[in-house]
Each structure stands twice: as structure tokens, then as C-alpha cells.
């Protein structure tokens, strides 16, 4: 399980504080029809309002696919992870059935590629 390595830095470390901050940023908007969105992944104090504006308009879905860069160059350039993500709001589980379907010639499971990454931690 991946720990919240940037909790308390990129976003509040406690669930209560994080919920309060998210409630202040997320405002219900009319959903838009889309297949994807580009969302910033910096600390909430820098880009939280922009990310929240995008998330508020995304259609509801059972699974969201998060794609981020391999900042450090370790492991495969396009890698999947089986790890769950512990967050101040609870645990986010990966959709392993979808990940297995995506796994193949250019995408594969590689925890090394994810070990030092922090960008998805402010998105999950």
C-alpha cells in the first residue's frame, strides 16, 4: 500500500482538514461530456482551484484512469501499479481488472516506476 508521502505538504494531512479544503474548492457544476481531462498535480495551494474546477465538471464514473509522467526515469516508461493508495480520506483501490486489460506490449506492471513518483498523490 502506498502511503500519503506528501500529505501535510501538497494538501492537508488530516481527513477533516482535507474535507474542509475540498468543500471550499469543489463547487457543483454542469457535467460536460468528455473522455479525459488534463489536470494540474501540484500542491493544492498552487493549483487546487484549477484542478477542482475540472473535477467538478467530470461525469461520474466507477473508474478513472490517472496518467502521469515518470519524473525520475526509473522502471518502465509506461507502467501500471497494483498498489492501493492510502489517503487522509481513506484507501483508494486500483481497478485491477482494467489494469490487466491494459497490460501488454507497451504497458506493464512496474512498481519501480511508481516508487518515487509524487504527482499522482495530489490527484488520488
Give names to the regions the model predicted.
Residues 1-122:
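Active-site histidine-anchored catalytic micro-motif
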Amino acid at each position: 500500500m502506498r502511503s500519503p508521502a506528501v500529505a501535510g505538504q501538497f494538501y492537508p494531512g488530516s481527513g477533516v482538514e482535507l474535507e474542509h479544503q475540498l468543500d471550499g474548492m469543489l463547487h457543483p457544476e454542469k457535467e460536460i461530456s468528455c473522455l479525459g481531462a488534463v489536470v494540474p498535480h501540484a500542491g493544492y495551494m498552487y493549483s487546487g482551484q484549477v484542478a477542482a474546477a475540472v473535477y467538478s465538471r467530470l461525469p461520474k464514473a466507477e473508474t478513472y484512469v490517472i496518467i502521469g509522467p515518470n519524473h525520475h526515469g526509473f522502471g518502465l516508461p509506461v507502467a501500471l501499479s497494483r498498489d492501493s493508495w492510502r489517503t487522509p480520506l481513506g484507501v483508494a483501490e486500483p481497478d485491477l481488472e482494467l489494469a490487466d486489460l491494459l497490460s501488454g506490449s507497451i504497458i506493464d506492471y512496474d512498481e519501480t516506476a511508481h516508487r518515487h513518483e509524487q504527482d499522482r498523490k495530489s490527484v488520488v
